[in-house]
Amino acid sequence: MATANLRRGYVLGLTAYVIWGLFPLYFKLLERIPAVEIIVQRAVWSALFGAVLLLFWKHPGWWRELRQNPQRFVVLAASGLLIASNWMTYVWAVNNGHMLEASLGYYINPLINVMLGMLLLKERLRPLQWLAVALASLGVAQQVWQLGSLPWVSLVLALTFGFYGLIRKKAPVAALPGLVVETWLLLPLALVWLLFFADGPTSETAFWSTPEALWVVAAGPVTLVPLVCFNAAARHLPYATLGFLQYLAPTLVLLQAILLFGEHLDSSRLTAFAFIWLALAVYSFDAWRSLRRLPQPG
């Protein structure tokens, strides 16, 4: 049974990260639609699809618990704005030739989490964690020196997702209900935008009779299915294994950027990636070594 659960965990985890890693292929199908319009539609269809999913959610007490702690709605509203900002930056990057920067941002994210833990949660870093953060900082500094500006796409993606995770710690709601409630709280903003500011393709009635409309509607399941797979995988896999699997998504994005969409990995970018990869190797080794030192059950 344990082996079967582990195998199931690997399949589910790989499914989640492969879907996340292939997001650029999906968003390229919507390339003519502005990023903000895609995100508004994504919020709407995720809210609707999420409502259907929650009808089958096995933990029905989540809504009662949320209503008994109304301050969590405020936290989820803030985290919803952060994840929407993350989504919009990512979609813009994919459809404007900045997939390499997007990939770099998600490579940096675990190290940003370490820094946020140190600065805001007063967590103490181990020596190898300090080394990993220093190497990542050198990678970012190298980009600033070469380009003359901050790699803002990478930093916005890493910081919004890092703060998103940090804020969600303040609202202990299961991942799926939490994300669905976030999209529900985004709905008023989305509807205002659709009613008063929408002037792109999806605002035209004729659009909804085209095949492209199906891809827009698919934003709901495309957003939520990998999250469901990830949550299920987390119940069957060691945390360290999930930590290693998370690098699959940015690696797939990196490969698509170079092999499919013609983005150039020049020596400057390669140097930055090398610093980040080395930092992640140090970080992963430190995490693995720390887990080995924990007392084993039984």
From Swiss-Prot:
PANTHER family: ACYL-MALONYL CONDENSING ENZYME-RELATED, SOLUTE CARRIER FAMILY 35 MEMBER G2-RELATED. Signal peptide: none annotated. GO terms for cellular component: plasma membrane. Belongs to the EamA transporter family. It comes from Pseudomonas aeruginosa (strain ATCC 15692 / DSM 22644 / CIP 104116 / JCM 14847 / LMG 12228 / 1C / PRS 101 / PAO1). Residues 18-141 form the EamA domain. The keyword Cell membrane applies. This is Uncharacterized transporter PA0485. NCBIfam families: rarD (TIGR00688). Keywords: Cell membrane, Membrane, Transmembrane, Transmembrane helix, Transport. Its main location: membrane. It comes from the Bacteria. It holds the Pfam family EamA. It is a multi-pass membrane protein. The chain crosses the membrane at residues 9-28, 38-60, 72-94, 104-121, 128-145, 150-167, 174-196, 211-233, 240-262, 272-291. The keyword Membrane applies. It is found in: Cell membrane.
